From Swiss-Prot:
Residues 30-39 have a biased composition (Polar residues). Essential component of the PAM complex, a complex required for the translocation of transit peptide-containing proteins from the inner membrane into the mitochondrial matrix in an ATP-dependent manner. Seems to control the nucleotide-dependent binding of mitochondrial HSP70 to substrate proteins. The keyword Flavoprotein does not apply. Transmembrane segments: none annotated. The gene is GRPEL1. InterPro entries: GrpE, GrpE_coiled_coil, GrpE_head. Pfam families: GrpE (PF01025). The lineage of its organism: Eukaryota, Metazoa, Chordata, Craniata, Vertebrata. The modification N6-acetyllysine is found at residues 94, 100, 215. It comes from Homo sapiens (Human). This is GrpE protein homolog 1, mitochondrial.
Length: 217
């Protein structure tokens, strides 16, 4: 009985194995489904990649705009820095030039006092006494005149000019009015008398002339 069962089982094994073997049609269908799934994933990935460029392009445009603004701002700052540097250079140069021109201003003011004394001394010498029979006074007067002429040459050499504006129009920047008086034959507003001469150093009033001004009668 047992032997008969064994023989029956051996006859049934090939048929059972054949029934368990996978069907080619099923394998093909499974393969197609698998490939379809892969293709779908690839298509979705490609779609996402195609959707990325617009976002990247927008980002690049924003970066470009930002960089252009930064460049413009940097250029403006550079231009302002250049302008400030040039202004500073010009101011420094002007200060140096003014120092050269007006550095002797205080010294000149002191020398003006000496020039005033020489002028007064020359004016005080009685002209009628200057004769050959009075050689001492004559020599003294000539010495004073020569000294005054020489000091005026030195003043001119260094840009210091005398202001003796008799008959000129009154200028408040160069003259200081001590009094106003009507003078016949003189135009009102002009200088009638110079009490003390003034001086200008390189065009700048160092000391105004003290004057009397003509006014209407």
């Amino acid at each position: 009985m047992a032997a008969q069962c064994v023989r029956l089982a051996r006859r049934s094994l090939p048929a059972l194995a054949l029934s368990l073997r996978p069907s080619p049609r099923l394998l093909c269908t499974a393969t197609k489904q698998k490939n379809s799934g892969q293709n779908l994933e690839e298509d979705m990935g490609q779609s996402e990649q195609k959707a990325d460029p617009p976002a990247t392009e927008k980002t690049l445009l924003e970066e470009k705009v930002k960089l252009e603004e930064q460049l413009k701002e940097t250029v403006e700052k550079y231009k302002r820095a250049l302008a400030d540097t040039e202004n500073l250079r010009q101011r420094s140069q002007k200060l140096v030039e003014e120092a050269k021109l007006y550095g002797i201003q205080a010294f000149c003011k002191d020398l003006l006092e000496v020039a005033d004394v020489l002028e007064k001394a020359t004016q005080c010498v009685p002209k009628e006494e200057i004769k050959d029979d009075n050689p001492h006074l004559k020599n003294l007067y000539e010495g004073l005149v020569m000294t005054e002429v020489q000091i005026q040459k030195v003043f001119t050499k260094h840009g210091l000019l005398k202001l003796n504006p008799v008959g000129a129009k009154f200028d408040p920047y160069e003259h200081e009015a001590l009094f106003h008086t009507p003078v016949e034959g003189k135009e009102p507003g002009t200088v009638a008398l110079v009490s003390k001469v003034g001086y200008k150093l390189h065009g700048r009033t160092l000391r105004p002339a003290l004057v009397g001004v003509v006014k209407e009668a």
